[in-house]
Amino acid sequence: SDPALKDTKLLVHRTDFQDIMRRFLKGDEGMIEAVMYWLRHLGGEEGIFNYITSHTGFTLNDLVSYDGKHNEANGENNQDGPDYNYSWNCGAEGPSRKKAVCALRNRQIKNALFLVLLAQGTPCLLAGDEFGNSQRGNNNVYCQDNPTGWVNWRGLKSNREQWEFVKELIYLRKTYCVFHPKEEMNGMDKVGC
């Protein structure tokens, strides 16, 4: 009711979508019902923001490349940053040249981007996730004012396929209203019933 705040919008930092989608991506059992709920959930009048990665935690590339955090460079004996990342390294910790590992990681990244960009609500991407940015397994780069914490824009050239995939998903979302309805989907065709 304060006139100074009349145009102010408050956002809630919720990790429900993030945690459920991460667990689904890595193959945890019993996630389908929760995934289906969060894919169609609009969040009521206040709306909802959906993300799988954010400024606190792994980048999308690191989410599929590391099972555990690697925050040694932060000077806190790897005690800082979240311990539970719901990540899976796809068979090798950190960077890999194995074709099967790289192919699986690329597929998992595309799956994650698909979930975020085509779920109901407002999609949010961590800067650099659209082209494979990495923080080398550091999930708490608050003190890394160096290449570890910076977005490496060279990835835009070296990971063009991922960038194009993101653009295609954005095009789909903008073009087809089924990806941004005014009302929450309920799992049945109301018009045809």
PLM regions with names:
Residues L126-F131, Q135-R136:
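Short acidic/histidine-rich active-site segments
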Residues Q135-K167:
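Extended hydrophobic/aromatic segments used for targeting, binding, or gating
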Residues S1-A127, N140-Q144, C177-E184, V191:
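Conserved alpha/beta catalytic core and glycan-binding cleft of carbohydrate-active enzymes
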Residues S158-C193:
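Catalytic cores of secreted or luminal carbohydrate-active enzymes
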Residues L39, N89, V151-R154, E164, ...:
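Short linear interaction motif-like sites in intrinsically disordered regions of transcription factors
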Residues V116, E130, L169:
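Hydrophobic, well-ordered secondary-structure elements that form the walls
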